[in-house]
Amino acid sequence: MAVASVMIVAGCADPGLTGAGQTPLAGPRAGTVTTPISPTTAPRGTPSRSATTTSPAPGASDPGTLTLAFGGDVHFEDYLRPLARDPHGLDQLRSTLGAADLSMVNLETAITQRGTKIGKEFHFRAPASALDTLASAGVDAVAMANNHGVDYGPVGLRDTLAAKRASPIPIVGIGADQDEAFASATLTAKGVRVAVLSASQVYEMTLLNWSADANSPGIASSAPTTRLIAAVKQARRTHDVVVVYLHYGLDYQQCPDGQSVSTATALEAAGADIVVGGHSHRVNGAGWLGNAYVDYGLGNFVWWRSHEPDSRTGVLTLSVDVKRATAARPTPGPIVRKAVWTPMLIGADGIPEVASGADATRLLGVWRQAGRCTGLTTSP
């Protein structure tokens, strides 16, 4: 089936003009995972014109290009619960999210079947088997620094941390203390060492009451950004690529707020190559910021709302130049050379499906429009 997507590349005309048809990314997965490292300094653009093209993005078989795919918010509540107990419940995502060399989502739930709800409107939880479902779908790591990771209080948090220790894929952004919460996980593919980190700056009761500190468990809080910046700088010293998956932005807004912009700017200066995230439940814009590629909001992904605009989503696939990523990089410049947005709609079953025809054209327009309020450039 044809996949409609926008591809942003360096060197041609404006990407805001036309949509494009593209075949799905494909190829064997080549990633391996190593254990997280603890955090404790190395900063490292200039825009040109760009184009929307119809040529396929480099897939997992291209040795000179590392592809990283990102999806938005995932939970397993309500009618999504059976998916968490079916190890193949999300396997249809392998042709999109799972087709890249490495992929990542935001796991917006406590991993527990116990505990007491904390005082808020919505509460999400899932059994540890949900991690097997995600792994089978081709997900290589999940971010859990968000406002639902501790929805079931201290008991739920203990279960979540136990699930993290036994997880088939790395979980970042939550831990038994601040060191663990801010620790990066290392993913390796095509000889490229990729650090992934996660933090939240959403001001609500999870961040206020359940931010990890020196002696207490919880999520990694980037309010203030001091500890996150230190973690990025440490990861920069020991990795070829540094990815930060943030929980940021304002509910139901399609443009980034000032705090999100300032945080992304600070992370780029600290050495992050890729900054992505969500929280707004809306697809936001994306583009290049100096040496980094930034996405201000990936939207919902596996979710219990199947009506627009909540159901608008997609997969962001970034192509990293392997030679440049693994070189010393004495001169500045981004290692992400190409970005592809594949628009999708969440179906009645809560699972996103690739948009086609008029829907694809319309959703590509929504994504391009969202990019116009970001201040980001459309090419490296």
Segments (PLM) and residue ranges:
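C-terminal motif of bacterial Sec signal peptides marking the signal peptidase cleavage site
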Residues: V9-G11
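Acidic, metal/ion-coordinating pockets
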Residues: A13-G31, T35-P39, R44, R49-P380
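N-terminal export and membrane-targeting signals
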Residues: M1-A4
